[in-house]
């Protein structure tokens, strides 16, 4: 993990550096994601500068997870074969030393996926990204969610996030009106984003995938998560300026990711520091 002081200026410059590095290296991001967002996720990764792959067959995930630069696991649409593929891929990625990002969609609302998420947590993913209800439920403190929606503010989940981060040895991101990332010691808030983003399905899942892209080029999981959430939030803000509603927001979001650069980051990245 970095020993640099996490000032707002440092975080912005690090995000700029990582975005440049990501676009040079075009990391291969292995996604086992949900059926609702596969197209959106792949296009967002391409727009950012990464290379997406949606390999989920149990016959292929072991070898592909070792080949890829990072692995993103999303529990949005569950089935027994997908669960088996997730377990195989996570084990392979961990053995190969590749970063793993877990998105525990609807954990706390449905028992099967809650049990699966807790099993996957034992493999110690580098980064966990969820809404407040999901993070609280994953930490074992109940929930209050309605699937992908959260009835709890992101600040209410900070203690649970810290517990999870210490348990995994990685970072936990809690997304909401303000996003927060902690590794159990450090805490960073990201205040970028726009309310219209909640009217488009899958942008939270997309944020997880973008975190996976940054994790492929940044060894510090907290910094990788911060960079991914900042990029997502900024793209959402820029898209909302040009969009007439949720439909056009989806298109504008991809264009904004593609256009994201150092000038935009220096001008508009908003960090919330303790």
UniProtKB/Swiss-Prot annotation:
Pathway: Cofactor biosynthesis; thiamine diphosphate biosynthesis; 4-methyl-5-(2-phosphoethyl)-thiazole from 5-(2-hydroxyethyl)-4-methylthiazole: step 1/1. Keywords: ATP-binding, Kinase, Magnesium, Metal-binding, Nucleotide-binding, Thiamine biosynthesis, Transferase. It comes from the Bacteria. The keyword Cell inner membrane does not apply. Substrate binds at residues 54, 202. HAMAP family: Thz_kinase. It is an enzyme of class 2 (transferase). InterPro entries: Hyethyz_kinase, Ribokinase-like. Its EC number is 2.7.1.50. This is Hydroxyethylthiazole kinase. One of its GO terms (biological process) is thiamine biosynthetic process. Belongs to the Thz kinase family. It catalyses: 5-(2-hydroxyethyl)-4-methylthiazole + ATP = 4-methyl-5-(2-phosphooxyethyl)-thiazole + ADP + H(+). Its cofactor is Mg(2+). The keyword Methyltransferase does not apply. ATP binds at residues 129, 175. Catalyzes the phosphorylation of the hydroxyl group of 4-methyl-5-beta-hydroxyethylthiazole (THZ). One of its GO terms (molecular function) is ATP binding.
């Amino acid at each position: 993990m970095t020993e640099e002081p996490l000032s707002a200026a440092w975080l912005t410059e690090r995000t700029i550096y990582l975005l440049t590095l990501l676009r040079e290296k075009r990391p291969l991001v292995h996604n086992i994601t949900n059926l609702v967002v596969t197209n959106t996720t792949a296009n967002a990764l391409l727009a950012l500068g990464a290379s997406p792959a949606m390999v989920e067959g149990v016959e292929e995930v072991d070898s592909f997870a070792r080949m890829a630069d990072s692995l993103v696991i999303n529990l949005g649409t569950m089935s027994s074969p997908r669960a088996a593929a997730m377990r195989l891929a996570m084990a392979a990625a961990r053995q190969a030393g590749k970063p793993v990002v877990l998105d525990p969609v609807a954990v706390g609302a449905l028992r099967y996926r809650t049990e699966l998420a807790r099993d996957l947590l034992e493999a110690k993913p580098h980064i966990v990204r969820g809404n407040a209800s999901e993070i609280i439920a994953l930490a074992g403190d109940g929930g209050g969610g309605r699937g992908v929606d959260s009835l709890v503010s992101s600040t209410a989940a900070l203690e649970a996030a810290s517990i999870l981060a210490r348990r995994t040895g990685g970072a936990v991101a809690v997304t909401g009106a303000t996003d927060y990332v902690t590794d159990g010691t450090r805490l960073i808030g990201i205040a970028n984003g726009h309310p219209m983003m909640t009217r488009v399905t899958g942008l939270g899942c997309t944020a997880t995938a973008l975190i996976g892209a940054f994790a492929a080029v940044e060894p510090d999981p907290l910094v990788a998560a911060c960079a991914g959430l900042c990029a997502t939030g900024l793209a959402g803000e820029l898209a909302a300026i040009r969009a007439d509603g949720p439909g056009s927001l989806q298109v504008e979001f991809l264009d904004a990711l593609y256009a994201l650069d150092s000038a935009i980051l220096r001008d508009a990245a908003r960090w919330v520091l303790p």
